[in-house]
């Protein structure tokens, strides 16, 4: 029996490979944040960002598997070292929110291009990424709102750290 083979444009293959690279880069960024947080004594936040790092690898796997299922060889990306010059838990919370906004824009582009090409299978996967981004934006926005609402003194930051650990 012949293997299932489906046409997918070079543009969408490129975007799927880009998705892999961005998800793996996100994983490394969140790992760098987790390491910094742990080093600075924010053990709860470190656990949560470690969890985020693992989730991003799972998201990369979706794209790897999708391309493999279409009999397309995915590209394993070469990645630069992630940002690691963090200054505070607050800095990390805001950086996470901005990063998730960027990832959302990238997922929207994938969905828009898949729609333009009437590639509804790729659009379905892009929608899955966008559904995930709704959750990611809500999570990062929650922490931004906590800081904006309650402030940034040490007691509040310790409470946020503890709450992050509870959510890990």
Question: Residue spans of the language-model regions?
Answer:
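Iron-associated oxidoreductase/ferritin-like identity signal
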Residues: 1-168
